[in-house]
Amino acid sequence: MKIRTRYAPSPTGFLHIGGARTALFNYLFAKHHNGDFILRIEDSDNSRNIKDGEKSQIENLLWLGIIPDEKPGSETKFGPYRQSEKLERYQKLAQELIKKGFAYYAFDNQEELKLQKKEQIAKGIFSFRYDQNWLKISDQEKQKRLKNKHFVIRFKVDKAKNFCWNDLVRGQICFEGSAISDWVIIKSDGFPTYNFAVVVDDFDMEISHIFRGEEHISNTPKQIGIYQAFNWKTPKFGHLTIITDKNGKKLSKRDKNLFQFIEDYKNQGYHSEAFFNFLALLGWTSPDSQEFFDHKSLIKAFDYKRLSKAPSHFDIEKLNWFSKSYISKMPVDKILENLELSDNQIWNRFFVETFQKSSIKYADFYKNFEFFHRPKQEMDEKMLEIFEKLDKKPVKIFASKIDYQNWDYTKINDLIKEIGQKLEITGKNLLLPIRLATTFTNSGPELARAIWLLGKKIIEKRLLKWK
């Protein structure tokens, strides 16, 4: 049997960190076993779908390096890959369940359902149990009500059964059928509910293994019931633990202190392979505690048995460390492909070489680029106050000896060393006066590099009064 996994988002939002990790683990598992990874779009809830939601999901998966073997638009025997294109299939199978006695029409209105819930709460039953009243009506009454077209189709849960599975992450899990209410499989608008459509889709696409978030544990017994009703083979399930923030709380889309969506990290210029690597370690560890993996080595190393049963912690500092490490090892040409800087390619290369080791993300290059592209017109008060207390001799010598005709980093660096030897000074005593006079700031990259990047016109203008 070929391993087939899937990631099945709804286009109701953009790709979230948790969703990306789910997609990644399904992808790694499939590729480790030479299987297929499928992207399916669960768009049956039109009221919640957002414009470009599907496009965002696909583009951000591709940015991470999670490449589906099949997706919307693929022409295979397993499609279509959007739920909205399969409505007839769901409705046909729902009718089949009715004929087999596994489902039935229910004609309750909202007020009647509220009354049922209220009566059960009064009896101390706080988890709603649908009372199956509509199973007792005559065929004549049923046909009469069907003409009004206000009904849903409910799955008839076998209350005598236990619904169990050996979870790939958590081990044996069981739910008593008596604790599960008869649930809606087809809504009044004719659209399937999630728990019904997802089973049909997974069966149609021959999905063998499903890794998903722990919030789906309570959905699993309902889905197993559908598999059993059709006598279909049930896939293997694995439920991943939650991802928490630095305070140990579950990641929330309402938390404004941490980017929640992959799009945000992409736009900030995080290294995509670094994020891929970092994401894999949110709930999975290698046998030898290795942390750095390229794409192929991660696929080779991935073993679902090493998925954690404990919550994983999203550590932004760890992500920054990964991204910085990846960027520091990149060929300069590759970095330049991701940046739009000046028209001077020699300057661009020197600029990237200057900031490569200190940059966490591509946005850091742009931040530093602004310093040179839009240089300050004068020293601010704070810097001026520092500068006034310093010995100006290094600045005067530098201003009188710098060679503007042969603008060269090595010559600038040698001149600074020469001044230090002449005045018998080092460190801040040598560098800080020159740095403030030339760059108008007391910090930055190696001084000679900063001076070269600012360019001879700006430096000559700033040092004019010190000649």
UniProtKB/Swiss-Prot annotation:
Gene3D superfamilies: 1.10.10.350, HUPs. Keywords: Aminoacyl-tRNA synthetase, ATP-binding, Cytoplasm, Ligase, Nucleotide-binding, Protein biosynthesis. InterPro entries: aa-tRNA-synth_I_cd-bd, aa-tRNA-synth_I_codon-bd_sub2, aa-tRNA-synth_I_CS, aa_tRNA-synth_I_cd-bd_sf, Glu-tRNA-ligase_bac/mito, Glu/Gln-tRNA-synth, Glu/Gln-tRNA-synth_Ib_cat-dom, GluQ/Sye. It is found in: Cytoplasm. GO terms for molecular function: ATP binding; glutamate-tRNA ligase activity; tRNA binding; zinc ion binding. It holds the Pfam family tRNA-synt_1c. ATP binds at K253. CDD domains: GluRS_core (cd00808). A motif ('KMSKS' region) lies at residues 250-254. Coiled coil: none annotated. The keyword 4Fe-4S does not apply. It is an enzyme of class 6 (ligase). A motif ('HIGH' region) lies at residues 9-19. It comes from the Bacteria. Its EC number is 6.1.1.17. One of its GO terms (biological process) is glutamyl-tRNA aminoacylation. Its main location: cytoplasm. GO terms for cellular component: cytosol. It catalyses: tRNA(Glu) + L-glutamate + ATP = L-glutamyl-tRNA(Glu) + AMP + diphosphate. Belongs to the class-I aminoacyl-tRNA synthetase family. Glutamate--tRNA ligase type 1 subfamily. HAMAP family: Glu_tRNA_synth_type1. Monomer. Catalyzes the attachment of glutamate to tRNA(Glu) in a two-step reaction: glutamate is first activated by ATP to form Glu-AMP and then transferred to the acceptor end of tRNA(Glu). This is Glutamate--tRNA ligase.
